[in-house]
């Protein structure tokens, strides 16, 4: 059967369950088929209880204690007893083995610790500590926390609030030995026993002490070797009894001697120093407070806590975080200024003998010595602080998610719109569409020949282009041919009186006037309706305007010799072309109006889409912030 100790309170729900409280011990516990439940006996009542509310008590040392007396009663140990009796003699009080078992039980006592600092429990399973209490240590549960019993109550307590008493059990055994010695060897001992409280004589023989050890029951303990151990322990008792007298007589002299011992050891070992790189203010009494650039004498790097060193600064010893200082050599400790580099060393650096002398003669109190020994058992230590970063961390995706919901990312600049091609004026009107197009991110559609409306069949585009190029050349360069260039070769010849040339000019039209009329008629008719800007625009459809110029010039030369019927037909053809051109202009204006309306509608749609996109971006950024907050909340919970 196994025993369990209760760690948490539990109230019974059913009749077959036990009501348990913290610290109670349940006997004769056995496991049940039902998972998570045990059955045991408490206060004469047997019942069930949950296994996660209790903890098993390990009893590995008890069977060994029970077997020890059996092993010691073997014949081999009796032979060693005979050897001792032959050497030291038989004690008058006889041998009584009963006190021996009590002494062994005391020897197998669990280790104890003494409370150095008061502690108030933060949880139900912790012990309340008062300075001076003695706790029986059961086990080390985790780093920094032990389990033990105090005033018959089991619980946890911090290990750095107590000091382990290693010699407590030996002292109790020594006291038990002295009591048993008085009861066994006091009345019949042939020599006075030094354990009665009287001071031993300077030349006293230690024979009675050895006999006392045998009479106490040590004859069953592994031969004569243990006997010598008992002798040394009795001598240590005498030294302990003499130690208070020495302390009273010498006083502070012993303190100076104790102070000089670590200094002598320090001379053998190389001294270590470290320079502070960040200021630090101590939060506890055993911590050092320093500024940046100070030199600390490093005493030890092992303080029982990771991240903390022990050192001395301005005559005060204490601990400090190791990431606030950098270890340096002994040569560099004389140059605490970090701004200037150290000058080249001309020789070995002088040793700080005066400082060492001051350290040797520095008086220390008993309380200071206790504080030194208890540096590792300080109440609490803050975690070593992290060195602040020298430069700000670059923005990450997580940082972008934490932006405020109202902040928007800067927009990328839009691509500049290329300048539209120059547009021509129609009937002297300035086109306002080009100015609107510049403000819109749309490019002006080009009027390709394929997109133009279908012309009537009577309109000849090539003839119109040739004619326009001819008129442009006449207007721009004043290339109107004179009448002399248009006369026939025989016009200046002498004529016969009273006769004219046969049927040449068709009814009395003078040769000098007819060419001019033929030139003026088309010019006057066309110049009233067609402007040079239209000719420039129409000329853009021609692939080779330079080649059509000579042909137009030849047409002008030949038109001077056309008959009136031909001129009339040509004028009618020109009128038909004018009407078709007017239709084309109307269609183009209508198309431009339609395109302008489409652009306006398209711009409105784009603006609406932009607004909706901005709203979606804002909603998404808010959603990402909410998701980040939820993730943090889940991680923290």
Curated annotation (Swiss-Prot):
Protein name: CD2-associated protein
Protein function: Seems to act as an adapter protein between membrane proteins and the actin cytoskeleton. In collaboration with CBLC, modulates the rate of RET turnover and may act as regulatory checkpoint that limits the potency of GDNF on neuronal survival. Controls CBLC function, converting it from an inhibitor to a promoter of RET degradation. May play a role in receptor clustering and cytoskeletal polarity in the junction between T-cell and antigen-presenting cell. May anchor the podocyte slit diaphragm to the actin cytoskeleton in renal glomerolus. Also required for cytokinesis.
GO CC terms: actin filament; axon; cell leading edge; cell periphery; cell-cell junction; cytoplasm; dendrite; endocytic vesicle
Modified residues (Phosphoserine): 80, 86, 224, 458, 469, 510, 514, 580
Alphabetized Gene3D superfamilies for the sequence: SH3 Domains
Record bears the keyword Coiled coil: yes
Glycyl lysine isopeptide (Lys-Gly) (interchain with G-Cter in SUMO2) cross-link, chain position(s): 58, 523
Complex and partners: Homodimer. Interacts with F-actin, PKD2, NPHS1 and NPHS2. Interacts with WTIP. Interacts with DDN; interaction is direct. Interacts (via SH3 2 domain) with CBL (via phosphorylated C-terminus). Interacts with BCAR1/p130Cas (via SH3 domain). Interacts with MVB12A and ARHGAP17. Interacts with ANLN, CD2 and CBLB. Interacts with PDCD6IP and TSG101. Interacts with RIN3. Interacts directly with RET (inactive) and CBLC; upon RET activation by GDNF suggested to dissociate from RET as CBLC:CD2AP complex. Interacts with CGNL1 and SH3BP1; probably part of a complex at cell junctions.
Comp. bias (Low complexity): 542-555
Protein modification: Phosphorylated on tyrosine residues; probably by c-Abl, Fyn and c-Src.
PANTHER family listed in its UniProt record: CIN85 AND CD2AP RELATED, ISOFORM J, SH3 DOMAIN-CONTAINING
SMART domains named in the record: SH3
Coiled coil: 580-635
InterPro entries tied to this protein: CD2AP_SH3_1 (IPR035775), CD2AP_SH3_3 (IPR035777), CD2AP_SH_2 (IPR035776), Endophilin_SH3RF (IPR050384), SH3-like_dom_sf (IPR036028), SH3_domain (IPR001452)
Cross-referenced PROSITE patterns: SH3
Region Interaction with ANLN and localization to the midbody, annotated ranges: 1-175
Pfam families registered for this protein in UniProt: SH3_1, SH3_9
């Amino acid at each position: 059967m196994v025993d369990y100790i209760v760690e948490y309170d539990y109230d019974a729900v059913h009749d077959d369950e036990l009501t348990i409280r913290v610290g109670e011990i349940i006997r004769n516990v056995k496991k049940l088929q039902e998972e998570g439940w045990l059955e045991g006996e408490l206060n004469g009542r047997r019942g069930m209880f949950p296994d996660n509310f209790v903890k098993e008590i390990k009893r590995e040392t008890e069977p060994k204690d029970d077997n020890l007396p059996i092993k010691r009663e073997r014949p081999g140990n009796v032979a060693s007893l005979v050897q001792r009796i032959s050497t030291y003699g038989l004690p008058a009080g006889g041998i009584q083995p009963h006190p021996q078992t009590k002494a062994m039980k005391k020897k197998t006592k669990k280790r104890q610790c003494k409370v150095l600092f008061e502690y108030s429990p933060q949880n139900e399973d912790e012990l309340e500590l008062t300075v001076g209490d003695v706790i029986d240590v059961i086990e080390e549960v985790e780093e920094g926390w032990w389990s033990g019993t105090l005033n018959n109550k089991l619980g946890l307590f911090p290990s750095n609030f107590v000091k382990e008493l290693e010699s407590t059990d030996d002292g109790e055994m020594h006291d038990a030995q002295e009591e048993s010695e008085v009861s066994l060897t006091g009345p019949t001992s042939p020599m006075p026993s030094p354990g009665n409280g009287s001071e031993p004589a300077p030349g006293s023989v230690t024979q009675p002490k050895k006999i006392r050890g045998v009479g106490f029951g040590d004859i069953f303990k592994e031969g004569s070797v243990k006997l010598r151990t008992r002798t040394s322990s009795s001598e240590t008792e005498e030294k302990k009894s003499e130690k208070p007298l020495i302390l009273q007589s010498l006083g502070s002299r012993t303190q100076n001697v104790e102070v000089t011992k670590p200094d002598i050891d320090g001379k053998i070992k190389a001294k270590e120093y470290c320079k502070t790189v960040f200021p630090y203010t101590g939060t506890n009494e055993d911590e050092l407070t320093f500024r940046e650039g100070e030199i600390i004498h490093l005493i030890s790097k092992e303080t029982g806590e990771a991240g903390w060193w022990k050192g001395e600064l301005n005559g005060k010893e204490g601990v400090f975080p190791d990431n606030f200082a950098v270890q340096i050599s002994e040569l560099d400790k004389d140059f605490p200024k970090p701004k200037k580099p150290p000058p080249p060393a001309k020789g070995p650096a002088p040793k700080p003998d005066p400082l060492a002398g001051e350290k040797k003669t520095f008086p220390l109190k008993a309380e200071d010595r206790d504080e030194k020994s208890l540096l590792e058992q300080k109440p609490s230590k803050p975690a070593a602080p992290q060195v602040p970063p020298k430069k700000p961390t670059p923005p990450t995706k997580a940082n972008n998610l934490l932006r405020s919901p109202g902040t928007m990312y800067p927009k990328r600049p839009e691509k500049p719109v290329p300048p539209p091609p120059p547009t021509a004026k129609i009937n002297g009107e300035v086109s306002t569409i080009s100015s609107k197009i510049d403000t819109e991110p749309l490019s002006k559609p080009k009027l390709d020949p394929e997109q133009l409306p279908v012309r009537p069949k009577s309109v000849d585009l090539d003839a119109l282009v040739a004619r326009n190029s001819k008129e442009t050349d006449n207007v721009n360069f004043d290339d109107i041919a004179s009448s002399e260039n248009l006369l026939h070769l025989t016009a200046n010849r002498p004529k016969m009186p009273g006769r004219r040339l046969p049927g040449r000019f068709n009814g009395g039209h003078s040769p000098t006037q007819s060419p001019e009329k033929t030139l003026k008629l088309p010019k006057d008719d066309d110049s009233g309706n067609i402007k040079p800007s239209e000719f420039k625009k129409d000329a853009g459809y021609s692939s080779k305007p330079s080649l059509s110029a000579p042909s137009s010039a030849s047409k002008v030369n030949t038109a001077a010799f056309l008959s009136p019927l031909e001129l009339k037909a040509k004028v009618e053809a020109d009128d038909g072309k004018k009407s078709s051109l007017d239709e084309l202009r109307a269609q183009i204006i209508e198309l431009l109006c339609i395109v302008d309306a489409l652009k306006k509608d398209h711009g409105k749609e784009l603006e609406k889409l932009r607004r909706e996109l901005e709203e979606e971006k804002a909603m998404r950024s808010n959603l990402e912030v909410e998701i980040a907050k939820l993730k943090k909340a889940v991680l923290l919970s």
